[in-house]
Amino acid sequence: FILEAPGGLISIKAEVKNKITKSVEIENLSSFVDLLDAKLKTESFGEIIVSTVFGGDTFIICNARDFNLTIEPKNAKKFVEISKEIIKIANHEFGFSHPTIPSLDYISFCQFIEPVQVNSSQQKEGWNTVCIRPGKLDRSPCGTGTSARLALMKEKNEIDVNEVFISRSIIGSTFETKIKEQFISNGKKMIKPLIKGSAFITGKQELYVSKNDPFPEGYRLNDTWPDF
C-alpha cells in the first residue's frame, strides 16, 4: 500500500504471518548526495569533513570519531550539543540544493556515523544517531537518515545495489536495508532505498471532528520555532 509521509508518497509492504505483522519494508524517496566530503570549519572542533545528503529530508553527515565519541547512550547529550553548532554553521556555509524542490535550501538534521564494519553474519553494518533540534535524537536507526547514509555509501563505493546493510541505532535497534536501484535524475545520481524493520503498538488514539468546529480541517501558522 501507499503511505503519505512528510517528504512524499512511499510504498509499504508488510510481512504478515498468522495475522501478525512480522516486519514492514518501505521503499523510500529517491536519495542523493548534495556535497561529498566537504570541509567545514567549526569553532569548537576545528576543520572536519562532512557530507550533505537527502534521504527524505536533508542531513549533514559527520564521523563520530572526529569528536572522539562512540555512538552509545552515555554520549547522547554530547551528540545533541555538537549537532547544534554543526547545523548552524553548515546552513550558513553550505545550505542545501535539491534539483526539484528549490525551497528545500537548508539542512534539517545532523547524523553522526561510525565506520562500516562486517558482522558475524558477513553483512555490512554501521552505527548512527540522528540529532533533532532543539534537544532530541532518534532512538531508531532513522529511516530518512539511513536512506541518506545509503546514498552516501553508494557514492563512496562502499555498497552495491541489492547488498544488505544493517543500520544500527544508538540503543542497538536495527533496520535491514539495501539499495533497490541507482539512476540519474535531473543530473543527480540517485538511489531507491529499501528499509525493513518492525515496531510495536504502545497506544491507541481516537480523534473527533465536531460539526460545529469552525476549523474542521485544522489551521496553519508560519514557523514559530526559534533559531538555534
Language-model region placement:
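Active-site proximal loop and beta-alpha junction motif in alpha/beta enzyme cores
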Residues: F1-F228
